[in-house]
Amino acid sequence: MRVSFLVPVYNTDPAILTLCVNSVLKAAAGIHEVVVVDDASDRADTRAFVDRCEKAGIDGLRIIRNSGNHGVSFSLNQAAHAASGDFLAPVDHDDVVVTPGFNQMLRSLAYHRSRWAYSDEIQVDEKGFLIRRMFKPDYSPQLLRSLMYINHLQVFSKDLFEDLGGYREGFEGSQDYDLALRMSERCTPLHVEEIAYHWRILDKTQSRSGEQLSASSVDNGRRALEEHFARKQCVAHVAPVLFKRHAHTEPEPIGVYRSRLAANQDSKVSVIIPCRLGTTKRINDKPLVLLEHCLQALGWSFVEKEASRVELILVLNAGDDLKKGEEAIVRRGL
């Protein structure tokens, strides 16, 4: 198993970029590959750092330069296209890969024969100090449809990535979320309970400015989720959840979405009632025929237009009279 780390670069502080590249080179350990794509940086010290990396002639380090500034999705696709590994691991240009956690991911992928895995991570500030640890749950499709909790580090099959067409341009800021939703339609990701990534939270990135998420990132995440439901042939209304961070500020999106799925008008529900005719029980000193009581409650529950989509199945004892069972249903108008 060979992994290609994909590192898109644009106007990155060389000090932070040095930490990032050194961390992935350490994790690569001369076995795996690191593909750095400079998306036409106009910052001189960033370009100078990329030049030094190229001239260093480090085994397993490849440098690609885009002819223009095309965005992160384009850059990641360029890196993936050039990658020689059979697995891919995207890494943000200001983050750090933790070697022991990455190695555990490789062992888990091999043991479980999985095509996609994600790890736990920690968030750090601009100087690398701990903000919070993020210990994630195992895969939950419902949770993924609410927020992009998988995040970093992800390692997934290049074949899977290419089958899906890679990252989609136009989803910048939420391109990882869009890809994760599409991959989840093909396979189930494996959660590796190891910290393999330091996610650096900067004041200003493509997806956020300070605490506030960018409007384009939130909207792209909403579109990715809506299209996911459409591919699943579900009708859903998706809206970002708003949260008031401070007493003096307006509610704002926090990267969480609420999806309301419309009921399928053609679907039917089968209500199965195993019973013995004539069975009674005293409730509040009042004898109740259990089947009659059950059917009465069901009748109260359905409106007329719903009743046509409900099927009642009575499972009676061998000695019971089927005709009496049918009569009980008719009496309740079901």
Question: Would you name each region that the model predicts?
Answer:
Residues 22-31, 293-309:
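Short, acidic, metal-binding catalytic loop of nucleotide-sugar glycosyltransferases
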Residues 88:
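Short aromatic/hydrophobic "clamp" motif used to bind/position activated sugar donors
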